[in-house]
UniProtKB/Swiss-Prot annotation:
GO terms for biological process: coenzyme A metabolic process; isoprenoid biosynthetic process; sterol biosynthetic process. This is 3-hydroxy-3-methylglutaryl-coenzyme A reductase 1. SUPFAM superfamilies: NAD-binding domain of HMG-CoA reductase, Substrate-binding domain of HMG-CoA reductase. Belongs to the HMG-CoA reductase family. It comes from Oryza sativa subsp. japonica (Rice). The active site is at E211 (charge relay system), K343 (charge relay system), D419 (charge relay system), H517 (proton donor). The chain crosses the membrane at residues 63-83. Residues 98-107 have a biased composition (Low complexity). NCBIfam families: HMG_CoA_R_NADP.
C-alpha cells in the first residue's frame, strides 16, 4: 500500500516539476493552470495524509512534495498575479493568457508598463492580454494611451481611422469626466448667429451643427428681434430633480413614508441632511407619487452653475440613508426611478419643470415682419395655431408645441459642452404668436420648462466648448453670484429658440422653406460623388 502511494506521489511531483517550466509548454496557459491546480490539490492531499501518520517521520517523497508546493508560488517564471489596477470599476478580472502574448514589463505595476515599448503594448491590447480600458492607469500618459488604443483598434478591425482627428485634444482633461477609452474626437462645424439682443445685451450665439440653413435661419430671426427692440426673458424656476424608487411592505406603509417626506414640519430636517453633500446644492421641495407599495420621491434642488445631476444624486443618497433609520422596512430599489425624469419626454417635466424654467418673448414690428421675414403678421399667427398648436395636439405631442426648438437646443448644447441627450426634455417648448397693437405687430413667446444646462462640469472643460461659453460671457462659475452664469445660459438658449422659431415659421408661411434648403442644405455634392 505504501509502495503504490509512494509511486503516485513521485509521479505527481514529477508532473508538477515539469509544469513549472511555464514558457516551454505548448498548451494555452488556461490549460496549464488547470493541470497545475490539479497537481496542487493531489499533492496537498497526499502530504496531509502522510503527516497525519504520526508513527513514521517524513521521508524524501514528503519533503519533495513540500518543496513543490513552495516552488509553485515562488517560481521566477510564473505569471504575476493581477495587481490593484483591477479595481477600476469595470467589474471583472483579467483572463489568463499565454505568457508569450503578454510582454514581461506588463506583469508588474504601472512603472514596468511605462518602460514597455509601444509595439509590445499594442500587441497586448490587440490580443486581449491587456484590457484597453486600463491603458491610462497603467501608462500614466493619457495621450499615449489613446494613441496606442487607436492603433490596436486598427489591427483588431482591419480598418483605419485616419479621418478621425487625434491631435488637438487634451486627453488628460477628459479622463474621468467626459469619455472613456478615447481614440480621437469628432469634428463639427460651429457657426455663429447674431447678434441676439436679449435683456439689453447682445450675444453672438455659437451653434454646432451639420444641418445647412439652420444657422442662417436663426441669424435671420436674431436680426428681426434686434431690429424690433430685442427680446426679454424671465426665469420662472431653477431646480434640478432626482427621484429614487423605494419599496415598502404595503401600500399603507408607503403612504406613511409619503406623508412623512412631504410634511412641512420635516422639511428643514431633510433639507439639512440633503445639503451636507454640497456647498451649492440646496433642497427646494420633495414631491412623492405612489404605485402600489412603490414610492417615488422627487427631490428638487438648486445646483449653482453646475447642471447638477451628480450634486442632487449625492444629496438624495444622504436622505435615503436617514430615511432607512426612520423606516427600516424601506427597500431602496434605485436612486433613479424615472420620476425625475431624465432624458425622457414626460408630463412631470412639462408641468413641474426640471432644471431652468424660462419664458422668452419679443414684439416684432410689422414692417420688420414684411421686410426681414417676408411675410405678414396674420399669416404667422394662423400658421402657428394650425401647425404648432392644433397639429401637435393631433399628433399627441408631449411638450412639442413648437416648430423646431430641438434644432437650436442641440446645436447650442454641443457647442457649449452640455449633455446632448438632455435635449429631449430641454427642447420641450410651446411657441405662442399673437397679433398686438391693433394687428400691426406680432407678439411671439417661447415657454421652456426644462432647460438643463451648466457652465461647469461635464463637457464644459473642453477647450472648444469653453471657448464658446467664453464667447457668451458665461464661462465657468460665477463667484460673485453662484448660479448666475448657468441661469444666463438658459435664457440665451430660450432666446435663440425664439429666433429660430420666428424664422422657420416665416419661411413656412412665405413658402420659402424648400428654396432655402436647396440653397444651404444641398446633398447634390454627395450625390455627385456617389455617382462618380
Amino acid at each position: 500500500m505504501d509502495v503504490r502511494r509512494g509511486g503516485g506521489g513521485g509521479r505527481i511531483v514529477g508532473a508538477a516539476r515539469r509544469a513549472l517550466t511555464w514558457g516551454a509548454l505548448p498548451l494555452p496557459m488556461r490549460i496549464t493552470n488547470g493541470l497545475a491546480m490539479v497537481s496542487l490539490v493531489l499533492s496537498s492531499c497526499d502530504l496531509l495524509r502522510l503527516c497525519s501518520d504520526r508513527e513514521r517521520p517524513l521521508g524524501g517523497r514528503e519533503f519533495a512534495t513540500v518543496v513543490y508546493l513552495v516552488s509553485l508560488f515562488a517560481h521566477p517564471d510564473a505569471p504575476a498575479t493581477t495587481t490593484g489596477d483591477d479595481d477600476d470599476g469595470q467589474g471583472g478580472s483579467r483572463r489568463a493568457r499565454p505568457a508569450a502574448a503578454e510582454p514581461a514589463p506588463m506583469h508588474g505595476h504601472g512603472g514596468g508598463m511605462m518602460e514597455a515599448d509601444d509595439e509590445e503594448i499594442v500587441a497586448a491590447v490587440a490580443s486581449g492580454a491587456l484590457p484597453s480600458h486600463r491603458l491610462e492607469s497603467r501608462l500614466g500618459d493619457c495621450r499615449r494611451a489613446a494613441r496606442l488604443r487607436r492603433e490596436a483598434l486598427r489591427r483588431v478591425t482591419g480598418r483605419g481611422v485616419e479621418g478621425l482627428p487625434f491631435d488637438g485634444m487634451d486627453y488628460q482633461a477628459i479622463l474621468g469626466q467626459c469619455c472613456e477609452m478615447p481614440v480621437g474626437y469628432v469634428q463639427l462645424p460651429v457657426g455663429v448667429a447674431g447678434p441676439l439682443l436679449l435683456d439689453g445685451r447682445e450675444y453672438h450665439v455659437p451653434m454646432a451643427t451639420t444641418e445647412g440653413c439652420l444657422v442662417a435661419s436663426v441669424n435671420r430671426g436674431c436680426r428681426a428681434i434686434s431690429a424690433s427692440g430685442g427680446a426679454f426673458s424671465v426665469l420662472l424656476r431653477d431646480a434640478m430633480s432626482r427621484a429614487p424608487a423605494v419599496k415598502l411592505p404595503s401600500a399603507m406603509r408607503a403612504a406613511e413614508l409619503k406623508a412623512f417626506a412631504e410634511a412641512p414640519a420635516n422639511f428643514e430636517l431633510l433639507a439639512a441632511v440633503f445639503n451636507r453633500s454640497s456647498r451649492f446644492g440646496r433642497l427646494q421641495d420633495i414631491r412623492c407619487a405612489l404605485a402600489g407599495r412603490n414610492l417615488y420621491m422627487r427631490f428638487s434642488c438648486i445646483t449653482g452653475d453646475a447642471m447638477g445631476m451628480n450634486m442632487v444624486s449625492k444629496g438624495v443618497e444622504n436622505v435615503l440613508g436617514y430615511l432607512q433609520n426612520v423606516f427600516p422596512d424601506m427597500d431602496v430599489i434605485s436612486v433613479s426611478g424615472n420620476y425625475c425624469s431624465d432624458k425622457k419626454p414626460t408630463a412631470v417635466n412639462w408641468i413641474e419643470g426640471r432644471g431652468k424654467s424660462v419664458v422668452c418673448e419679443a414684439i416684432i414690428k410689422g414692417d420688420v415682419v414684411q421686410k426681414v421675414l417676408k411675410t405678414t403678421v396674420e399669416k404667422l399667427v394662423e400658421l402657428n395655431i394650425i401647425k404648432n398648436l392644433a397639429g401637435s395636439a393631433v399628433a399627441g405631442a408631449l411638450g412639442g408645441f413648437n416648430a423646431h426648438a430641438s434644432n437650436i437646443v442641440t446645436a447650442l448644447f454641443i457647442a457649449t459642452g452640455q449633455d446632448p441627450a438632455q435635449n429631449v426634455e430641454s427642447s420641450q417648448c410651446i411657441t405662442m404668436l399673437e397679433e398686438v397693437n391693433d394687428g400691426d405687430d406680432l407678439h411671439i413667446s417661447v415657454t421652456m420648462p426644462s432647460i438643463e444646462v451648466g457652465t461647469i462640469g461635464g463637457g464644459t472643460c473642453l477647450a472648444s466648448q469653453a471657448a464658446c461659453l467664453n464667447l457668451l460671457g458665461v464661462k465657468g462659475s460665477n463667484h460673485g453670484s453662484p448660479g448666475a452664469n448657468a441661469k444666463r445660459l438658459a435664457t440665451i438658449v430660450a432666446g435663440s429658440v425664439l429666433a429660430g422659431e420666428l424664422s422657420l415659421l416665416a419661411a413656412l408661411a412665405s413658402g420659402h422653406l424648400v428654396k432655402s434648403h436647396m440653397m444651404y442644405n444641398r446633398s447634390s455634392k454627395d450625390v455627385a460623388k456617389a455617382a462618380s
